[in-house]
Amino acid sequence: RDEQLRVADPKSGKRLTTFNNTTRVVVTQGKAFLHTIDNLQCLDLTRKAQLETLLGTQKAALKKIDPKVETNLAQIEALKKEISTLQTQIKSCLLWTIDHPAPFELVVAGDQLIVGIDNQVSILDIKTGKPLWQHKVTGKAYGLTPAEGRLIVSTDLGHIHTFHFQP
């Protein structure tokens, strides 16, 4: 099923990015953690927005140049090369991606991404996506609340699980 989420600047209303085929996303400190078609990903939104702005500027400049004027050909080639470089750099804003079923909930707590799925809750490292911890729960893990070294998980079946982590 096609899902689309758009992120905009709350002050200006300007579109920052659009996520296609996305079921869940959480954004914090310039990073987006999102689920798209069997993958969980981390995207550097701050860098991506900067690069997309530059890309838009270069594409607009390219459109203004008349390709029929021979003296413009070198400038056109330089802009095309820069556009290609920017497009490659935008792809590198995807910091990591892992195979993962669709989550019911995503929460960032410190340097951890907490993920609730059917009958399980997991904690992933936000820098790498590598699993740090997981535990079975009864039902779909919708409510994820990290607080004071504990993780409280509520499910669609009414179960509340509490996990305590030692420092």
Predicted regions and their residues:
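Extracytoplasmic/lumenal domain signature
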Residues: 1-167
